[in-house]
């Protein structure tokens, strides 16, 4: 395979842009990963990786997450470097800290890989459980701890304990009811609290996550409440404790203009708070830094029209400009960019377990006295074989669709046989295929027909995974993730396909796919070879998906492999999660596996079966209880 074909693969699946330098097509027709783009020669073929891990760990079954902690560290360095350049470029005198909100992915490998990257990093918690995890890791980071979310006294005491232990812990006031508890608990612990305030902005982004920002946001104080908070702290003699201003526009901000507008509005809060005597030293712009899941570099919900440098420049310039205009000190800037840190580092890889294809066979003419809709379908087919016919492709399609509808109606009323229905459906597929060949993608009038027929004629690939467990955002909010075969892409991509999971739910289907510089409802695929079914990669699933996944049909967490590649290309990895067993999932819903096994044993004994068959049934049942929840290939 030559470089031209590799470039075509890059373009077909738009890997160059969503891959971010971490993923690319290689000259074997497979997909490779580069955990550290600073060392571009150190790459790893994903197909070979899966085979090697399975050879050395025979119990590893697909689906499995393949995680690359070095990508996390590279993302951290890249974001920090972008803000360093922005501060130098604009003469910004304040510091900068990237804070990781662990809600994005609380896995130990994520937190500790980021902390051990050798870069400044803070941690953010939004619950008591998360705060306990953060405090336990606090001695490993020299930055700040930000405490967001709703708080009770236990949460507040935990945060103040961290401050008492010498950490820089900010309790961000989200509701006015919190400040009374904070002041009371601080007095009991004899500690000066370090406070922040989350201001609710009028500015709001657009897209799937816009509700997390703006005036209707779940969290934050309105302008009048901010003033009340200041009065409360002044009366308590604790106004100097209020040191951090926090706001949040929304997650995955697609448009840089929305970010710039929001930062400028928040900068006015900074100015006004200083006028009121509040010495704000930290400016937390929250989340919003998006990633380009589509690779379209656009304002689409699953894309972004900016890069790291432009984001950093807009944030630093807006804050610095407001400070300079009002002769105020430059505060330390904080961003909570969890998605941008984690999305790229994880790939879900699974196997295709079956394919439903539209097979085209020669059609025999119907009987002379065939029912009208069947005869009409055949007339359309014969017309299409005659060159120079004046009817349009669109007209042929519409006529055949109407005839097929009549066939189905007459079948329901008992007027047509099953054989006649099958014949009509087969002929309709042949008509669609014939029309599809004659359509011109450059003709705008043909484009809707092309899309319609691609969906109708596409192959159905059944993949061994649960959409609800592994890609919950694809189901819940129709988020797009890059999906493609990780092997066999040197073959002609002359088929269109949709991917379906193995749950008993009609929602278990991926609706949108990256296709070139756009998004389609089907994806390009090579012809399916049942002897060598391709493995499918679901990319950029490192943010939120692991923790949001649910247990629909009792499909559990997948296995996970942490992979490291040094500068010389030497590979090391560890199986960090073996994946949930059936017994694990049954216990989640309070079904005791031992009790179930005993009840099954009783049924088998009472069935008066041959003893050898009894033993076989019991062995299979027990083996299944402690086996993988996903489909397993027979040895």
From Swiss-Prot:
Keywords: Decarboxylase, Lyase, Magnesium, Metal-binding, Polyamine biosynthesis, Putrescine biosynthesis, Pyridoxal phosphate, Spermidine biosynthesis. GO terms for biological process: arginine catabolic process; putrescine biosynthetic process from arginine; spermidine biosynthetic process. Pfam families: Arg_decarb_HB, Arg_decarbox_C, Orn_Arg_deC_N. Gene3D superfamilies: 1.10.287.3440, 1.20.58.930, Alanine racemase, Lyase, Ornithine Decarboxylase, Chain A, domain 1. It comes from the Bacteria. Substrate binds at residues 283-293. The modification N6-(pyridoxal phosphate)lysine is found at residue 103. Catalyzes the biosynthesis of agmatine from arginine. Belongs to the Orn/Lys/Arg decarboxylase class-II family. SpeA subfamily. This is Biosynthetic arginine decarboxylase. It comes from Proteus mirabilis (strain HI4320). The lineage of its organism: Bacteria, Pseudomonadati, Pseudomonadota, Gammaproteobacteria, Enterobacterales.
